[in-house]
């Protein structure tokens, strides 16, 4: 917002967060149910919910962010109000800002907002327990009459505070995080087996997730996962080329530098640091950490995080047997136990 509207904006946000009216609850319920229905018709997105459930089981990280239709349909105003009273308290709220403002003035405005909104004092309960030990690898499949199979293979990753996070980002870039990555080149560019193929990596407070996504026709599911398995094994064996690592480092550093041109990204960076209780590193320190990553670190991470016996799998498509046959290429034990 314009910097001269900061006080007004904080007043509105404070009222929304600490004193919502919960008006038009039934209408909003219908909107969310429509959003869930729309999501169900997008298998390339839905499969990511399935792989989270396969990876994290019944833990909160395994649940869809948008919620489930049966819960949204039945939740009452009383339940929502009770949850809000216990969780939306100042001790649980992180406020981050970036732009033309002074820290002291911002703090003063926040205190005023809290008073005007009559926000309760104290700190609420934790939103979720820590993931002490990940569950065994899981398998999820949803049968749909789709033209393509949408497949994710993933495993628990590393926390946002882990020193190896820079190596993990580079591993993601080399494996499938860009148009020059191995999976994109081997599966799409050289063989034309898929339009969408990529790797992904998320880092949370106490764990993370690493994995790959492939959307392809039935005949290509097995060969695509076989290629993915081969590329993971090749990186784990230490076969990262010097120019490959240099390109990944340049790409990662460039994206970080470009992101710093956005005030919104700077704000998000501050907020994530507070939420996850991690050190806020200077840009110079981040660049140095990226430059310091050696090929051996990538090999070790690939070997530890993406070992076949640790991989979960999720798929959406017409035939579960075809999906299970393909999964044998990445985690034979998981497929045979299904």
Where are these regions (language model features)?
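Charge-rich, well-structured scaffold segments of protease-associated domains
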Residues: 1-124, 130, 141, 146-151, ...
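Active-site cores that bind ATP or allylic diphosphates and position pyrophosphate for catalysis
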Residues: 134, 187
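Flexible, small-/acidic-enriched active-site or ligand-binding loops
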Residues: 137-138
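Helix-start/capping segments and mature chain N-termini
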Residues: 170-173
């Amino acid at each position: 917002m314009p910097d001269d509207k900061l006080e007004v904006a904080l007043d509105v946000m404070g009222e929304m967060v600490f004193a919502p009216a919960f008006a038009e609850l039934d209408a909003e319920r219908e909107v969310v149910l429509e959003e869930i229905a729309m999501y169900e018709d997008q298998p390339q997105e839905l499969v990511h919910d399935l792989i989270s459930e396969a990876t994290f089981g019944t833990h909160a990280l395994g649940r869809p962010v948008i919620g489930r239709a049966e819960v949204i349909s039945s939740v009452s105003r009383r339940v929502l109000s009770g949850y809000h009273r216990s969780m939306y308290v100042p001790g649980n709220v992180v406020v981050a800002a970036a732009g033309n403002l002074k820290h002291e003035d911002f703090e003063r405005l926040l205190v005023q907002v809290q008073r005007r909104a009559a926000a309760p004092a104290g700190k609420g309960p934790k939103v979720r327990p820590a993931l002490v030990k990940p569950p065994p690898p899981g398998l999820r499949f949803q049968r749909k009459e789709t033209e393509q199979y949408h497949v994710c293979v993933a495993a628990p990753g590393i926390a946002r505070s882990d020193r190896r996070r820079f190596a993990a980002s580079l591993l993601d870039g080399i494996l499938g995080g860009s148009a020059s990555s191995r999976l994109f080149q081997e599966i799409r560019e050289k063989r034309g087996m898929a339009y969408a193929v990529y790797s992904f990596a998320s880092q949370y407070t106490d764990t993370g997730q690493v994995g790959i996504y492939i959307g392809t026709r039935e005949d290509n599911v097995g060969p695509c996962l076989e290629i993915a398995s081969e590329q993971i094994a090749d990186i784990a064996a230490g076969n990262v080329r010097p120019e490959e690592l240099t390109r990944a480092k340049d790409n990662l550093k460039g994206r970080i530098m470009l992101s710093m041109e956005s005030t919104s990204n700077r704000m998000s960076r501050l907020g994530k640091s507070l939420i996850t209780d991690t050190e806020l590193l200077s840009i110079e320190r981040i660049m140095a950490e990226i430059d310091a990553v050696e090929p051996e670190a990538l090999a070790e991470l690939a070997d530890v995080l993406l070992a076949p016996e640790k991989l979960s799998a999720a798929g959406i498509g017409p035939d579960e047997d075809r999906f299970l046959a393909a999964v044998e290429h990445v985690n034979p034990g998981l497929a045979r136990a299904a």
